Amino acid sequence: MTKDAYIEFCKNLVGADTDQPFNEDFESTVARHFDTKKWFALVMEYQGKTVVNLKCDPMESDFLRSVFKGVIPAYHMNKVHWNTVFLESDVPDKEIERMTLTSFELTDKKKRMPKKSSKKSPKNPL
């Protein structure tokens, strides 16, 4: 998948937007949720190749890294929850799209479970 095709795929997701937030860096593109501005993909150059960082379930991350040479622990992000995917590699376009949709869902604030309150409730409030 080419960089332009990938960015177009991200732009076409309902509720997604893309931008280039880094000063003087016009090569990197962030795909984010329109309402929360939370990232779900970071497209950039790494080792002379175009890559995308995507959020992933930790168990699936390990599996994908073992199956595809083009999937490695994320560059410059949490390596447990994020993978770096080489766009023009052994990873099929449909798999890159699936991983992107997963990242989109995992970073969607509306889908996340509420955090447990750290405050203790009284045993007998009455």
Locate the predicted segments by residue.
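Charge-dense, helix-prone N-terminal extensions
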Residues: 1-126
